[in-house]
Amino acid sequence: MVDTESQKEKNHLNHKIYLDYNATTPPAREVVGTVAEALQEAWGNPSSSYTAGCKAKELIDTARARIAKMVGGKPEDIIFTSGGTEANNMVLFSAVENFNRTSKERQNNNVDWALPHIITSNVEHDSVALPLLQLQKTHKAEITFVPVSTVTGRVEVEDVISAVRPNTCLVSIMLANNETGVIMPVGELSQCLASLSRKRSAQGLPEILLHTDAAQALGKVEVDVQELGVNYLTIVGHKFYGPRIGALYVGGLGHQSPLLPMLYGGGREGNFRPGTENTPMIAGLGQAAELVSLHCAAYEVHMRRIRDYLEQKLEAVFGDRIRLNSRFPGAERLPNTCNVSLLKPAVLGREWLSHCQYLQASVGAACHSDRGDSPSPVLLKSGVPQDAARSAVRLSVGRETSQDDVDLIVRDLEQAAQLLGMNKQS
């Protein structure tokens, strides 16, 4: 009789087990079908009146409505973009340009001369952090990077409010961190900023707008722009089983929340984002959003159960040889994210993964894959000790990850650790 565990491993020999869903997700079957259908039947220009063009416009309108429903907004507040990077850049540069334009209208000498000031956290994705650094470098804006708490792993509301200046025009805080999974208190922050902005208005000071990059949260936890109270929210399709395009929610587009185009050309997307629309990818994004609207609660329950099972198995097998880096007291985290370090033997996270037979995962954010063997800055800033940060591996489960997958992966990580231990001794 064949040993059950051995049979499971044999069944996995021909495929790898993917646990890097925070980096990207495979397109859902329904999304692939929608994209293929649009390529065949809706290839026309959406601005034209013939059948293929009308079909394209219909698909785009449907997708816009579906994406708005997913985040609790209105269809007219959704702008399609090439991805999260473009959406984030649009918000940041719009805030700067809007401050400069409206400063001429304000009658307050305290801010007339000042550069616009933007507040963010020190653990943001590069698509927020690097544009802000560029604005700072070119003397177009003042930037404050508020440190996250090394206890909770999140940016604290009082620290953000303390950083506000008379010339502050925007706060940009991610909704959930891609490496630790920590969920930031954006809703609480928005309430404080709204109260503060009312006082500032009476003083002739600029309103403080609020942006959140929701790339990691969508499809894992419920996201509602009304509850969050944000002006802007970034949407990234490939993080929730959609295609690699994005969208930007802008509450009260053009009047309540200013937005300025970064590109100029044909009058698409309300003149905010020119260029003929990418109908198949937009339709696919809409389909992915519809799946989230229908099933997000079930996705969250499943991923949390599998993630918790993964951490229990890791603790049972490794004991004090590992450190779970994404457990922060007093902070919520994404239901799918486990950041773990192998402490004994002391190895690099990259080395641990390279000795695994089945596991496909990463040591952190894909945008930092060029940093070599240096520890993750996000983990260090979140209070993870340097030795643990150097050996960290990010394991992020998905909608279809099973307990059988976890069982095999934990054994895979264990045999990899044993091999590394023997190599260290020899």
UniProtKB/Swiss-Prot annotation:
What Pfam family does this protein match (any one)? Aminotran_5
Keyword Cytoplasm among UniProt keywords: yes
According to the lineage, what is the superkingdom?
A: Eukaryota
Q: Which residues carry this modification: N6-(pyridoxal phosphate)lysine?
A: 239
Subcellular localization(s) per the UniProt record: Cytoplasm, Cytosol
Location, primary (coarse class): cytoplasm
Q: What class of enzyme is it?
A: lyase
Q: Name one GO cellular component term.
A: cytosol
Report which reactions are catalysed by this protein: L-selenocysteine + AH2 = hydrogenselenide + L-alanine + A + H(+)
Alphabetically sorted, this entry's keywords are:
Cytoplasm, Lyase, Pyridoxal phosphate, Transferase
Q: State which Enzyme Commission number(s) the record gives.
A: 4.4.1.16
Query: What molecular function terms (GO) are annotated for this protein?
Result: selenocysteine lyase activity; transferase activity
Q: Does the keyword Transmembrane apply?
A: no
Give the active-site positions.
Answer: 367
Cofactor entry: pyridoxal 5'-phosphate
Q: What does this protein do?
A: Catalyzes the decomposition of L-selenocysteine to L-alanine and elemental selenium.
Q: Which family is it part of?
A: Belongs to the class-V pyridoxal-phosphate-dependent aminotransferase family.
Oligomeric and partner information: Homodimer.
PANTHER family per the record?
CYSTEINE DESULFURYLASE FAMILY MEMBER (PTHR11601), SELENOCYSTEINE LYASE (PTHR11601:SF62)
Designated name of the protein: Selenocysteine lyase
What gene name does this entry carry? scly
